[in-house]
Design a protein with these regions (language model features):
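Alpha-helix boundary/capping detector
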Residues: 30-31, 122, 143, 191
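Short, low-complexity, polar/charged sequence segments that are solvent-exposed and flexible
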Residues: 32, 58-61, 92-96, 114-118, ...
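C-terminal beta-strand edge segments of enzyme domains
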Residues: 40, 64, 129-193
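Short beta-strand-to-loop element that shapes/binds the nucleotide-sugar donor at the catalytic cleft/hinge
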Residues: 14-19
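CN hydrolase (nitrilase-like) catalytic-core segments centered on the catalytic cysteine
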Residues: 1-13, 80-163
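Active-site catalytic loop in hydrolytic enzyme cores
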Residues: 20-90, 104-111, 177-181
Length: 193
């Protein structure tokens, strides 16, 4: 990932299963910048329905990465279903969600991407896999959503592809300033698990 980020002069994001020296495994997301700087996030909400909790440990720290003037909150797949994880702090401009959502739940994928964008007044970048597992078919439909819930770009094909859209921090901040929803949000802290 470091080589690809450097060669393409772009940050890359993806997730891998990682086994630590203590034997604990994590579903870890990596945010790799072109200069070789790497930030990580360990998935917080493990997908019990799929047995993920039998193999992985839960991450308990949110990760916000600064890159080219934007602050990106990293979330992984099932985390998207839990709005409190992203809602309780206003410390980011965009959410990046790397996911493994099957075709059978594509409608939910689209709704949740838009909901997280609207309720947090932020961009949401959702990157979903394609391909097949023994019990699931994945059709992608990666998307970039703006702070009003509008789809800027969306993949329609069942193959790996590159999507691009311009995200503009000035217009994001102007929208937040004009329509001050975040000022009225409930203030709370998450208790350690």
């Amino acid at each position: 990932m470091k080589d690809m980020a450097s060669q393409n002069h772009a940050a890359l994001c993806g997730s891998l299963a990682v086994k630590e020296e203590d034997g604990n495994c994590y579903n870890r997301q990596f945010f790799v910048q072109p200069d070789g700087n790497v930030s990580t996030y360990d998935k917080h909400h493990l997908f019990k329905y799929g047995g993920e909790d039998r193999y992985y440990h839960t991450g308990n720290q949110r990760t916000v990465v600064s890159y080219q003037g934007f602050r990106f909150l990293l979330v992984t797949c099932y985390d998207l279903r839990f709005p409190v994880w992203s809602r309780y702090q206003e410390d980011y401009d965009a959410i990046i969600c790397v996911a493994n959502w099957p075709e059978s739940r594509q409608d939910v994928w689209h709704i949740l991407l838009r909901a997280r964008a609207i309720e947090n007044q932020c961009y949401v970048i959702g990157c979903n896999r394609v391909g097949d597992d023994p019990n699931c078919h994945y059709i992608g439909h990666s998307a970039i959503i703006d702070s009003r819930g509008r789809t800027l770009v969306e993949g329609q094909e069942e193959e790996a592809l590159t999507l691009t859209a311009e995200i503009d921090k000035e217009s994001l901040l102007a929208f937040r300033q004009k329509f001050r929803v975040l000022d009225d949000r409930d203030r709370f802290h998450l208790a350690p698990q």
